[in-house]
């Protein structure tokens, strides 16, 4: 039963990621050209600079032995910097680099491009929610700091320049299955 729940959860996250991918890319161009253009525009014409502050990592208890979760660090401290912009549809694009203490309390850098389809469901335009993805690379101590590509879902809720942004890293038993969240302050 736990295995079925685990696979359902992983497949759900993958489905959401791939369901949102086409919205990030224009219908006129291929997805790679659109991605390249969005990254380039975010790099060359940022509207904001962002401060990233890691808030929490949580290891899904259904996917880990208790003795492992008892040893893991779930309070990552660190910081990051980025630049971002809002496109003409109101969607968020960002380039970022962040370093934080991982599950083993070792430094883990991550950097990449993020995109979120953004909704402003209230009359107050400052309140916003988003769903999207991030693509980039990370490196970990237990993998000898060899860069590893990442493609992960993103979700956020925010008010004005402060956004609580999060992802879920899928995995297998005693590996992965981690919720990771951070604050993003836009300047």
From Swiss-Prot:
**Active-site residues per Swiss-Prot or TrEMBL entry:** 59, 102-103
Give the matching Pfam families.
PagP
Quaternary structure and partners: Homodimer.
Q: What is the source species?
A: Citrobacter koseri (strain ATCC BAA-895 / CDC 4225-83 / SGSC4696)
Q: Which UniProt keywords apply?
A: Acyltransferase, Cell outer membrane, Membrane, Signal, Transferase
Gene3D superfamilies for this protein: 2.40.160.20
Site (Role in lipopolysaccharide recognition): residue numbering on this chain: 68
User: Which residue numbers mark the site Role in the phospholipid gating?
Assistant: 173
> Which EC number applies?
2.3.1.251
The record's principal subcellular location, in a coarse class, is membrane
Specify the signal sequence span.
1-26
Family membership, please give it.
Belongs to the lipid A palmitoyltransferase family.
Q: Which GO biological-process labels does this protein carry?
A: lipid A biosynthetic process
Reaction equation(s) it catalyzes: a lipid A + a 1,2-diacyl-sn-glycero-3-phosphocholine = a hepta-acyl lipid A + a 2-acyl-sn-glycero-3-phosphocholine; a lipid IVA + a 1,2-diacyl-sn-glycero-3-phosphocholine = a lipid IVB + a 2-acyl-sn-glycero-3-phosphocholine; a lipid IIA + a 1,2-diacyl-sn-glycero-3-phosphocholine = a lipid IIB + a 2-acyl-sn-glycero-3-phosphocholine
Q: Which domain of life is it from?
A: Bacteria
The answer to whether the entry has keyword Transmembrane helix is no
Mind telling me which GO cellular component terms the entry cites? cell outer membrane
Q: Which gene encodes it?
A: pagP
Molecular function (GO) terms for this protein are: acyltransferase activity
Matching entries from HAMAP family are given as: PagP_transferase (MF_00837)
Subcellular location, record wording: Cell outer membrane
What is the name listed in the Swiss-Prot or TrEMBL entry for this protein? Lipid A acyltransferase PagP
Q: Does the keyword Signal apply?
A: yes
Function statement: Transfers a fatty acid residue from the sn-1 position of a phospholipid to the N-linked hydroxyfatty acid chain on the proximal unit of lipid A or its precursors.
